[in-house]
């Protein structure tokens, strides 16, 4: 999971049990230095836990962006700046098969799979941006252009605060973790 300020690497088995994980505070930059750190941390976890590399089935990379149908293209990114050829950039550092996933869809799907949800489920992600996912029968509903769960950009206050997306009154402009901590002197747990 790559965010504006953190890199998280989680190794799971096919039953979705967490085998190992790490989280680093490191601002995202589409640079050689950043991707060297990503590769180093990825290699640490894999080599420690999977002696037989052929047992690693693949890598999912969660990003706070809109992902194309092929899971290899980024169609819209404002939370973190990414170039359109980012898949090629990643492939210089990650040599196992990998695909991109929207961060909220990825988290929502994991919750859906781990839970005993058989009907429609909505997942809301509150972090440095607001995200969300709709699932039905443990499958993501992407909607038009894979924006089905983009709760953060629903207008809650017409003509309200300007959002980073360029529109006004979006939920994201009012309810991100960063905004909410302004009410509690930086301590989100107090909110």
Task: Give the location of each predicted region.
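HTH-adjacent hinge/linker in prokaryotic transcriptional regulators
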Residues: 1-32, 70
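Short beta-strand segments
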Residues: 1, 58-64, 123-129, 133
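Glycine/GP-enriched mid-protein hinge/lid loop-to-helix segment characteristic of carbohydrate kinases
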Residues: 21-23, 30-31, 89, 97-191
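Glycine-rich phosphate-binding loop and adjoining helix at the ATP-binding site
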Residues: 22-122
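Glycine-rich, phosphate-binding/catalytic loops in enzymes
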Residues: 16, 77-79, 182
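Hydrophobic "anchor" residues
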Residues: 18, 73-74, 140-141
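Glycine-rich nucleotide phosphate-binding loop and flanking beta-alpha elements
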Residues: 6, 67, 130
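Hydrophobic beta-strand positions
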Residues: 11, 66-67, 134, 155
């Amino acid at each position: 999971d790559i965010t504006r300020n953190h890199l998280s690497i989680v190794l799971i088995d096919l039953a979705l049990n967490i085998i190992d994980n790490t989280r680093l505070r490191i601002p995202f930059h589409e640079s050689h230095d950043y991707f060297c750190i990503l590769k180093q941390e990825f290699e640490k976890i894999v080599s420690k836990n999977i002696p037989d590399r052929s047992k690693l089935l693949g890598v999912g990379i969660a990003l706070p962006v809109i992902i194309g149908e092929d899971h290899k293209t980024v169609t819209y990114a404002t939370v973190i700046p990414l170039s359109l050829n980012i898949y090629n950039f990643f492939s210089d550092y990650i040599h196992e098969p990998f695909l991109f996933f929207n961060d909220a869809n990825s988290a929502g799907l994991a919750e859906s799979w781990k839970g005993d949800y058989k009907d429609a489920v909505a997942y809301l992600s509150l972090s440095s941006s607001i995200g969300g996912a709709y699932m039905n029968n443990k499958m993501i509903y992407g909607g038009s252009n894979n924006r089905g769960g983009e709760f953060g950009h629903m207008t809650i206050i017409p003509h309200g605060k300007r959002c980073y997306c360029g529109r006004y009154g979006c939920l994201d402009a009012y309810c991100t973790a960063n905004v909410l901590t302004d009410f509690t002197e930086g301590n989100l747990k107090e909110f």
